[in-house]
Amino acid sequence: MRRRDLIKAATALTAMGLSKSSSAIAAESMTPQSARPAFKAAVMRLPVLVPPSEDALNDVRRRNAEAMVEAIENVMRSASSKPRVISFPVLQFTSARRAVSGVPMSRVAVDLVSEPLDKGIFAPVVEACRRHNCYVATSTQEKVPQKEGWFFHTGFIMGPEGLVLRSPKAQAQSAPSVAYLRDIKDEYKSIFGENSIMPVAKTPIGTLACFVEGEAEVLEASRLLASKGAEVILHTSMEDDEIPWTALKQAIGFQCHVFLLTGATSRLIYADNPAGEWAGGSATIIGPDGRLLAEKGGQDEGYAVANIDLAAIDAAREKFGRNTVPAWDLYTDLYSQ
C-alpha cells in the first residue's frame, strides 16, 4: 500500500496543473510574474587536474578548488547579472579516473556529513556561494562514517548554508569500488531516512535536485525527481560522444517539464600530459519545453548562461501535460506484471 500511496501522491503533484478549475487558472493569470522565481543560471565546461600520486592529492585538491572559485568569480564578473545557480562537471575537487592516479579510494573519498562543508576542502566554494548568494553543484567520491567500506559517487549541492543536498548514484555505471544504491537501498534508507534516495531541496530559487553522469540515461530517475517537485535538476557530468546527449537531455526537459543544467568536463589534465585529454559532450541548459537555451561544447572551455523563469514550467505543463504527465497507476501495474 505504501508504494501505491507514493505513486498517487506523485500523480497528484505532477498533474496538478491539469485539474485546475477555470477560475483558478484565471486567478493565476492575474498573479504577478514575480510570484515565481526568475534568475540567471550558468553551466561550466572546465578541465580538472588528476593527482599523479597519493602524496600530491591534497595539493591537487587545493588547486582544483581554487580553479572552481576562479570560475565562479569569472562568471559573476562577466554575466550581465549574477547567476543564482551553477552546475559544474563531475569530481571537480577530487578529479576523475581515480585508478589512473593509483590513489586508493579510501584516501580519495571525502566525508560530506560529519562536519560542515565550510570546515574542510569545500570551504573556498562555500564561501564563494555566500559572497554571491548562489548554489553550486558538483560530485565527489564519498565515504560515510555510518558504514565503513561503503564508497559512493555522490552528486551534491552547496549553497550559502553549506550542504544543501547529497545524492549518491542510484544505478549508473561508476568505478568498481563504488556502491550502487540499487543494491543497498533498504540498508541505506534505514541509515539516512526514507526520502534519502534521490532527494530534492526547497530553496529561495525553487526546488533543486541533482544527479550524476549516466543517471540522465535512466528516464525514471528524472521522472522521480519531477514527481517529488524538482524544478531545476543540476546534472554534474563527464560525457563521451557515443551517447546522443543533447537529444537525451532535451527529452528530459520536455517530458518532465524541468530545467536541466549540465556541467561537463572539458579535459583531464595529467602531470605527464599538461595539454590534457579532451572529453566529449557539452555543458547545456535545457528548458521545460525541451529547448536548448545555452551550450558550451567541442574543444571550448568556460561557461554558458541562460535566464531561468520557473513560470515557464507551469506554461509547459499546461500546454503539454495531458500527454507528458504519466498515468502512474497504469504503468505501475504493467511494470509489476
Role assignments for model-derived ranges:
Residues 5-26:
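N-terminal export signals
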